[in-house]
């Protein structure tokens, strides 16, 4: 499956000057919502991702995603696997588990995102699950921004990845493009202003 082709065909691979949820800047942005608005495509991607996870021998009971971007990807993965789905969300900038969701002691989870950049939000969700007695057995996403090592793709881990070393990450593909700290952004130096299309703070 050519995940980059799918993103480009559906207008989900954006070019411009973007302020990422991490606070850094990039010339490119992956807007997964443009793909996930088509349920049949979301289902196909989730089926493919579940097969990757299953073929790796990973067994799990439930899927958890950080809101907002990860919800549809995680829900579809849980649907493909016939597993329970819950999500975490930010309240006053702190990731929390609400809405009556619970975690059983020893319950095995996959934390699923639409896109993994550094993995910060996924890690926050994982810490909540583990604090409640659950076990995170793996991370998953439709695509990886190239910073974290993906078990099924064999790419190298970079220093900015926040995911734990001892938990595998599974995705359908890598998108690798430059990310800049605001003070070193070449786009800013041309007078361009970064726009924020994504998650935190919106």
UniProtKB/Swiss-Prot annotation:
Q: List the disulfide bonds.
A: none
Give the protein's cofactors: Mg(2+)
User: What is a GO molecular function of this protein?
Assistant: orotate phosphoribosyltransferase activity
- Biological process (GO) annotations? 'de novo' UMP biosynthetic process; pyrimidine nucleobase biosynthetic process
Q: What Pfam family is a match for this entry? A: Pribosyltran
Q: What is its EC number?
A: 2.4.2.10
Q: Does the keyword DNA repair apply?
A: no
The residues that the entry says bind 5-phospho-alpha-D-ribose 1-diphosphate are 93, 113-121
InterPro entries per UniProt: OPRT, Orotate_PRibTrfase_bac, PRibTrfase_dom, PRTase-like
PROSITE patterns recorded for this chain? PUR_PYR_PR_TRANSFER
User: Could you tell me the keywords of this UniProt record?
Assistant: Glycosyltransferase, Magnesium, Pyrimidine biosynthesis, Transferase
Q: Does the keyword rRNA-binding apply?
A: no
The pathway is:
Pyrimidine metabolism; UMP biosynthesis via de novo pathway; UMP from orotate: step 1/2
User: What top-level class of enzyme does the UniProt entry assign?
Assistant: transferase
Describe the reaction catalysed, as an equation: orotidine 5'-phosphate + diphosphate = orotate + 5-phospho-alpha-D-ribose 1-diphosphate
Which residues does the annotation say bind orotate? Answer: 117, 145
**What interactions and quaternary structure are annotated?**
Homodimer.
Function of this protein? Answer: Catalyzes the transfer of a ribosyl phosphate group from 5-phosphoribose 1-diphosphate to orotate, leading to the formation of orotidine monophosphate (OMP).
Of which family is this protein a member?
Belongs to the purine/pyrimidine phosphoribosyltransferase family. PyrE subfamily.
User: Mind telling me which PANTHER family this protein's record contains?
Assistant: OROTATE PHOSPHORIBOSYLTRANSFERASE, URIDINE 5'-MONOPHOSPHATE SYNTHASE
Q: Which protein is depicted? A: Orotate phosphoribosyltransferase
Organism lineage reads as:
Bacteria, Pseudomonadati, Campylobacterota, Epsilonproteobacteria, Campylobacterales
